[in-house]
Amino acid sequence: MKDRQYRNFIIFWFSQSVSQLGSSMTSFALIIWSYSRTGSAMSVSLMTFCTWLPYIAASIVAGPVIDRYHKKTIMLLADLLAALCSLTVAALAVSGNLAVWHIFIVNGITGFMNAFQFPAETVAVGMLVPKEKYSQASGLNSFTSSLLTVVTPVMAASLSSFAGIKGVIAFDLATFLFAFSVLLFRIKIPENAGGTETGKKKEKEKISVQESWREGLQFLRGHKQLWYLMISMALMNFFSRLTYEN
């Protein structure tokens, strides 16, 4: 049973990694496109701002929502919304009407979606992977993150120079169809982690957003190390963004 769970995770991890590659390539290609049109670093910074502001705002309620609803459904809806955004950009590019402000709006929608997608995916991994294999799963996710950092600029720039922004988005949509199909038809994510009694109880309880917030804050108050870690990471990200823009 546990081996089957882990095999499902491997399939899930691979398909999501492929999809992340497509999404990362599109984001990078749009940065290139925006800068080539405007010659302004400010436009690139605004693209990032339009992504992260909705992400931060939506994160306030994302946790309780993810706790209350099925993780697979949330991921499917988020993926579908991201694909619609890519299709919109592709249609505008084909028609010759794509403008930088369109990308600002699309990035805002994508950032909002990611506030639900990323945590839901993280929780889903915990549900798919047996506890004794958590470190292996974490290693694979770290490998994906590092690999994407290296290969995304090369692949996005190469494909963009050869096929334009439309070619990059076409590749992104192909990776979306692959990951979406795998998640929809192949991956079964349990309603609660490991079928535990605690998980079942929480699924039955219809706790409010305020109660979820209170529970989360109580947990953090009892684990001060998490506060220190969160503050440290926030400061690192803030200062690194002063000199680095992806």
At which residue positions do the language-model features occur?
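Hydrophobic core of transmembrane alpha-helices in multi-pass small-molecule transporters
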Residues: 17, 92, 98-116, 234-235
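A single, central transmembrane helix in multi-pass transporters
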Residues: 163-170, 214-246
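C-terminal ends and interior cores of transmembrane alpha-helices
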Residues: 80-97
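Cytoplasmic helix-loop-helix junction between adjacent transmembrane helices
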Residues: 106-153
